[in-house]
From Swiss-Prot:
GO terms for molecular function: acyltransferase activity. GO terms for biological process: cell wall organization; lipid biosynthetic process. It is an enzyme of class 2 (transferase). SUPFAM superfamilies: CoA-dependent acyltransferases. It comes from Mycobacterium tuberculosis (strain CDC 1551 / Oshkosh). The gene is papA1. This is 2'-acyl-2-O-sulfo-trehalose (hydroxy)phthioceranyltransferase PapA1. Its EC number is 2.3.1.283. It catalyses: a (hydroxy)phthioceranyl-[(hydroxy)phthioceranic acid synthase] + 2'-palmitoyl/stearoyl-2-O-sulfo-alpha,alpha-trehalose = a 3'-(hydroxy)phthioceranyl-2'-palmitoyl/stearoyl-2-O-sulfo-alpha,alpha-trehalose + holo-[(hydroxy)phthioceranic acid synthase]. Required for the biosynthesis of sulfolipid-1 (SL-1), a major mycobacterial cell wall lipid. Catalyzes the acylation of trehalose-2-sulfate-2'-palmitate (SL659) by adding the (hydroxy)phthioceranoyl group at the 3'-position to yield the diacylated intermediate 2-palmitoyl-3-(C43)-phthioceranyl-alpha, alpha'-D-trehalose-2'-sulfate (SL1278).
Length: 511
């Protein structure tokens, strides 16, 4: 799947041309200092703790957990190894997330060790000689796992007149912003040095460790009666006490398999433009329309009259904009579909997304701590990511990398969430990360085809078509959905949810 100049694919589908590999890893002295680093009082962020727990739980089942963010960019010319060594070490010393490693003592006790002096981090280049595409991929995904300090590595693949720069970083220390801000940082520092200029001054990097402190101060003040916590509890209780599962079969989870990524074009450029117009006519944005289409597609595949989804949100503050780290929260989305038109569904989906934005600051694991009857997110919970390269901040990234080949790759291991990624540039495409087995592949193929079918119908003028009623709701489930939907609406919103409620809402969002 391509989003502007950025190609999103599985690493097995990446075919870098053979070349001489030079990779950067820490010196033995750096590794020794990291291993001796004292315990820090700063806990991991909630999303870091989730990654460490899920990695360990999957390993105990004999499964290889997906963990790496891999990004690459093609560069003309020969790599100046001395300049690149400087840039890599400057990057690692600039961002304090790289000074930490984590020790899992038990499921509820994860300890951070922290390197005091950033100068103790030193990466040096190693030349490996000519490698084939397959050998290159194997080397890049062999970056140490989440329980090692050096769970990040960098390299270049040198060819006659160009090279590929890559970064292979454990998600503990990076999120999708690295593909833009991180690569831009590398590019600007490297370009200045090879042009004979002194090292450039970069914007203040901020501190991921400070974010972890702020997050735990905020979550410690929450109670079971906090409105954001109550909203999460309401959502979880209607989904068996946790995040919603993907609604189609995914095969036997006890059978070991890797992960794969399946992509499909949803709409061409003209259809995308018409679809956006349909969203605007429904008083929704593109993301509201996409969530509506996913909800309708799930209804057509399963008969589910209400879609429950999770979508991630970057929770950086303005002070964190240049900070390297994992700043991802989740928003719960509730979208009734039965008996409604696309216009109504898209507007409800948009309202649910917008009014749920504050919930991204509340990690679900904290909600589970406050309400122990709930359960932490289970493997293969359903997650929907949306990337719009027509608006900021992605629009700036696409302009920056215009004319270059930029890639970001899944590492081919078992995914924890089942992630649906929808990307919009001129065209609109979707990719799904899923367990690589025949049952899951069949389900994901049907799922993507259903989404494509709905999107095309809307783009071709089918906004007035109403979704048929399929399954009647039990009284208890009806009450829960009614409560969830009212919570997701603003004053004045008109709701026509099948036979549940018809009202012009005059209550506030916490009613």
């Amino acid at each position: 799947m391509r989003i502007g100049p950025v190609e999103l694919s599985a690493v097995k589908d990446w075919d870098p041309a053979p070349g001489v590999l030079v990779s950067w890893h820490p010196t033995p002295a750096s590794c020794a200092k990291a291993l001796a680093a004292p315990v820090s009082a700063v806990p991991p962020s909630y999303v870091q703790a989730r990654q460490i727990r899920s990695f360990s739980e999957q390993a105990a089942r004999g499964l290889d957990h997906s963990r790496l963010l891999i990004a690459s960019v093609e560069v003309f010319g020969h790599c100046d190894l001395r300049a690149m060594t400087y840039v890599i070490n400057a990057h690692l010393r600039r961002h304090d997330t790289y000074r930490s490693w984590f020790e899992l003592r038990d499921t509820d006790h994860i300890v951070r060790h922290s390197i005091a002096d950033p100068a103790d981090i030193e990466f040096v280049p190693t030349t490996h000689g000519e490698m084939t595409s397959a050998d290159l991929r194997q080397h890049i995904v062999a970056t140490p796992d989440s329980l090692h300090w050096d769970c990040f590595s960098f390299g270049v693949i040198q060819r006659a007149d160009s090279f590929t720069f890559y970064a292979s970083i454990d998600h503990l220390h990076a999120d999708g912003q690295f593909v833009g801000v991180g690569l831009m940082e590398f590019q600007s520092m490297y370009t200045a040095l090879i042009m004979g200029e002194p090292p450039i001054g970069l914007s203040e990097a901020g501190s991921y460790v400070d974010f972890c402190v702020r997050q735990h101060e905020y979550t410690s003040a929450l109670t079971v009666d906090s409105p954001e916590v109550r909203a999460w509890i309401d959502f979880a209780e209607i989904n068996n006490g946790t995040f919603p599962e993907f609604p189609l079969p995914l095969g036997d989870p006890s059978v070991r398999c890797g992960g794969d990524l399946l992509s499909m074009m949803l709409m061409d450029e003209q259809q995308t433009q018409r679809f956006e117009s349909a969203c605007m006519a429904a008083n929704a944005r593109f993301i509201g329309g996409i969530l509506a289409c996913i909800a309708i597609a799930i209804h057509e595949l399963t008969g589910a009259d209400t879609y429950f989804g999770i979508t991630p949100k970057d929770i950086r503050t303005p002070a964190d904009l240049m900070t390297q780290g994992w700043f991802t929260g989740q928003i719960p989305v509730t979208v009734p579909v039965a008996g409604l038109s696309f216009n109504e569904i898209a507007r409800i989906a948009q309202t649910s997304f917008d009014t749920g934005a504050d919930l991204a600051k509340v990690p679900f694991e904290r909600v589970v701590e406050l309400s122990p009857s709930l359960r932490r997110p289970q493997p293969l919970f359903s997650l929907v990511n949306f990337f719009d390269a027509q608006v900021g901040p992605l629009s700036a990234v696409t302009k920056l990398f215009e004319g270059l080949n930029v890639g970001t790759y899944s590492d081919g291991r078992v995914t924890y969430p089942l992630s649906t990624m929808v990307g919009r540039f001129d065209e609109t495409a979707a990719s799904v990360l899923f367990p690589d087995n025949p049952v899951a592949r069949e389900s994901v193929t049907a799922y993507l085809r259903a989404i494509r079918s709905v999107c095309m119908r809307i783009a071709n003028g089918g906004t007035a078509e109403r979704v048929g009623n399929v399954v009647a709701l039990s009284p208890g489930r009806r009450n829960n959905i009614e409560r969830m939907t009212w919570r997701s609406c603003r004053a004045g919103d008109f709701i026509d949810i099948c036979n549940l409620k018809v009202a012009n809402v005059t209550v506030d969002r916490e009613a």
